[in-house]
């Protein structure tokens, strides 16, 4: 698989001198003809095995440089899932975190098995019945999940504890909604909101 991806990348590099000379890029469309489950792609990452993962409004796709493989984001034990994929992240344990319109699922990349992320805060709050905008990790290995209709969650992997943060408690609830999140190289977590500016945690 990696050899196919390498050949694909080399074929692109072959044309780079032309790109530099003309200032133009040639884009090759990867669509339903290649097996893509939906043309509305909301998230893209490359995993540690070299595969490209695409989250769409109708399914999770894995691309090996030639063809697509569609995955059913479904927890067989709990018997529920969701196919509207909005965020993707791979952690240090080669687990793929999949944000959907109904919370977060975790896929073991080695087995392909999905499990629903059902951790709860001390007050019993759970990331569910809400769409996920971002998933990322900070320098300490904590997983941060941005669920705009609920707030920002921090999951301590070592302890299994989940914490919820509301960036800017306000009478206007719509302004509390986090819209984007990132971690800078100093380890500070930045949260952009819908109408109340930007906040940071450190």
Where are these regions (language model features)?
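Carboxylate-rich, polar loop motifs that coordinate divalent cations or form catalytic acidic clusters
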Residues: 1-202
């Amino acid at each position: 698989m990696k050899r196919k991806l390498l050949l694909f990348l080399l074929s692109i590099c072959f044309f780079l001198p032309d790109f530099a000379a003309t200032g133009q890029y040639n884009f090759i469309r990867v669509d339903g003809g290649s097996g893509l489950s939906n043309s509305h792609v909301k998230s893209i990452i490359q995993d540690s095995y070299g595969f490209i993962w695409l989250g769409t409004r109708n399914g999770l796709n894995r691309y090996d440089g030639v063809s697509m493989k569609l995955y059913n984001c479904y927890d067989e034990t709990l018997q529920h899932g969701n196919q509207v994929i909005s965020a993707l992240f791979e952690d240090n344990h080669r687990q793929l975190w999949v944000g959907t319109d109904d919370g977060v699922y975790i896929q073991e990349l080695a087995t392909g098995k999905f499990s629903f992320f059902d951790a709860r805060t001390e007050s019993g709050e759970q990331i569910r019945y809400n769409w996920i905008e971002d998933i990322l990790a900070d320098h300490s290995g904590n997983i941060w999940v941005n669920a705009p209709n609920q707030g920002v969650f921090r999951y301590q992997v070592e302890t299994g504890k989940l914490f919820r943060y509301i960036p800017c408690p306000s009478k206007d609830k719509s302004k509390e909604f986090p819209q984007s999140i990132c971690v800078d190289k100093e380890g500070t977590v930045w949260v952009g909101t819908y109408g109340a500016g930007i906040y940071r945690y450190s």
